[in-house]
Swiss-Prot record:
Gene, per the UniProt record: EPDR1
Disulfide topology: C54-C184, C100-C234, C125-C222
Protein name: Mammalian ependymin-related protein 1
Function: Binds anionic lipids and gangliosides at acidic pH.
InterPro entries, sorted: Ependymin (IPR001299)
Complex and partners: Homodimer.
Natural source organism: Bos taurus (Bovine)
Glycosylation sites per record: N142, N194
PANTHER family noted in UniProt: MAMMALIAN EPENDYMIN-RELATED PROTEIN 1
GO cellular component: extracellular region; lysosomal lumen; lysosome
Keywords: Disulfide bond, Glycoprotein, Lipid-binding, Lysosome, Secreted, Signal
The keyword Disulfide bond belongs to this UniProt entry's keyword annotation: yes
């Protein structure tokens, strides 16, 4: 039965995905049946009845914006997602001058159980063990359908569906995923704990396929990688 780890930040180890400012799922098992709960599903599309999760693309590239409650910050990154080979590459983007902010590249190879953290400026490399199993970026088959609605306005809108890990009409969700009805592209994933949003990730500029598979190959400096994680902040 499909399972979710506790928090969605980077599809695997929570620490690993927090490092990359990515998405991960980390809040236990989903126990829905892929159907609208009582009272749900009456959005823009009206009463939709039973719904089945769509199948998200297996290989794509795009961009993401992640909000972390623990820091109160937003971070941006380029993302290469290869579900077929269970690997992800995250490249921090600089959108504004942030004093003493280090930018990193993250290469997560789940079949090998390792993550490489590479500082963009110096190519200094850390090699970190991934302790959590691969968790694909998709809608688990046992998710609960919440709603269908349109984003945007007249002539410029897209229809999306909202899914969650809510078990019944009387329980609260800890994960919400929004995916397009057409092609099942990820739009947003939100993770909550104790009724507060702790992680929220938006995906955009998605293109199917991996333009350059070599992005998953660590640089030569990783042959002598250190085992400790590097800090995102300057050391001085």
């Amino acid at each position: 039965m499909p399972r979710r780890a506790p928090l969605r930040v980077a599809r695997g180890s929570l620490d690993a995905w927090l490092l990359g400012g990515l998405w991960v799922c980390a809040l236990g098992c989903l126990c829905g049946v892929g159907m609208a709960a009582p009272g749900a599903g009456a959005g823009a599309g009206g009463s939709l009845g039973a719904q089945r999760p769509c199948q998200a693309p297996q290989q794509w590239e795009g961009r993401q914006v992640l909000y972390r409650q623990s820091t109160g910050r937003y971070s941006r990154a380029l993302l290469s997602y290869d579900g077929l080979n269970q690997r992800v590459r995250v490249l921090d983007e600089r959108k504004a001058l942030i004093p003493c902010k280090r930018l990193f590249e993250y290469i997560l190879l789940y079949k090998d159980g390792v993550m490489f953290q590479i500082e963009q400026a110096t190519k200094q490399c850390s090699k970190i063990t991934l302790t959590e199993p691969w968790d694909p970026l998709d809608i688990p088959q046992n998710s609960t359908f919440e709603d269908q609605y349109s984003i945007g306005g007249p002539q410029e809108q897209i229809t999306v569906q909202e899914w969650s890990d809510r078990k019944s009409a009387r329980s609260y969700e800890t994960w919400i995923g929004i995916y397009t009805v057409k092609d099942c592209y990820p739009v947003q994933e939100t993770v909550t704990k104790n009724y507060s949003v702790i992680l929220s990730t938006r995906f955009f500029d998605i293109q199917l396929g991996i333009k350059d598979p070599s992005v998953f190959i660590p640089p030569s400096t990783c042959q002598t990688a250190q085992p400790e994680r590097m800090s995102e902040e300057c050391s001085w």
